[in-house]
């Protein structure tokens, strides 16, 4: 794509963008149809106490991201040599199998193992984002990055509602079977409809990552974006594994725990979907770094009232507001990476970013599960707010040092 043609989109661009957007939507949909209820699914497979159930739930979340953290650099290297479309197909195809098979689980251990296997081959959204980063004029990077995030979050908005309704009506296995089928359709759509302007590069002709980092004008900023991605993802995953259990503790006598938990899990996605386009345009106007700093500060403040919520509907309200702010966090970090890294290194840089995101997910899910198991659920929100505050301070001091 000619980067100077900021307002002109070449033939075929729309089809690729919409196909990848839909693929990211289905990926987010499938994840949120199943994972918010994984602890309730596990509870039906054995007799576990609170600490065991919280720990197994946290491990089920964490195993996928442990695998991602280990394998992502390999896939990123392959993406820069073979193209991102192939990586999207690999992710969608294998995920369709692993998610479907998870629905056949007879024990919590089996679920944990399948989640690890899924993590080794996942990464559809990150590779789709990297593909679009290489096909988008820089003047529109903020909007496109926010739209790619909107796809996943829109899916995460609808997913818990569908998953909660299906789980209540037919049991916790059915959402896994449906998600597996949808991911197979995503594989077919990516294979047949996505066009990538990419020339295969041999291993010998590929520029070493060390040399690319040496040539970057601001390596420190890239590293800070990796750390920011890790902390932001940690703040999300510290809450997600325990949402359904927390809702159950707030409404112990309700007969619709799965449905209400689905609504609570969906509210951040609604907030993000409603605000992503506006925040994306804001990033293109005032700069992604400024949006990221303010987003971290406001997110920190929002975790204060979440520490003292009286009921599930209050939790849903504050998570909705957090979702609005979240539209300016990870997309801003991805936009900063896009604008400061050469296109030939997108695959590897985005894969390293995915590794940090995976590490954050592991730390967050284990932190949330451990704290909630040893203390109370409210302490999870307090700890999460503190980590976001630390991230904000890192960004603030970094900006001041670069402007000094």
Model-derived features: where do they sit?
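Structural signature of the two symmetry-related core transmembrane helices
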Residues: 86-101, 180, 290-305, 385
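Juxtamembrane intracellular "pre-TM" segments in multi-pass secondary transporters
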Residues: 2-14, 195-225
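Conserved MFS/SLC helix-loop-helix module at the cytosolic interface between two early adjacent transmembrane helices
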Residues: 69-106, 283-289
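Paired small-residue
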Residues: 98, 109-117, 302, 313-321
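Central cavity-lining transmembrane alpha-helices of secondary-active solute carriers
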Residues: 58-75, 266-278
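Pair of pore-lining "gating" transmembrane helices in MFS-fold secondary transporters
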Residues: 12-40, 44, 219-238, 320
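Short amphipathic helix-loop junctions that connect adjacent transmembrane helices
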Residues: 37-54, 242-259
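Cytoplasmic helix-loop-helix junction between adjacent transmembrane helices
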Residues: 114-152, 335-336
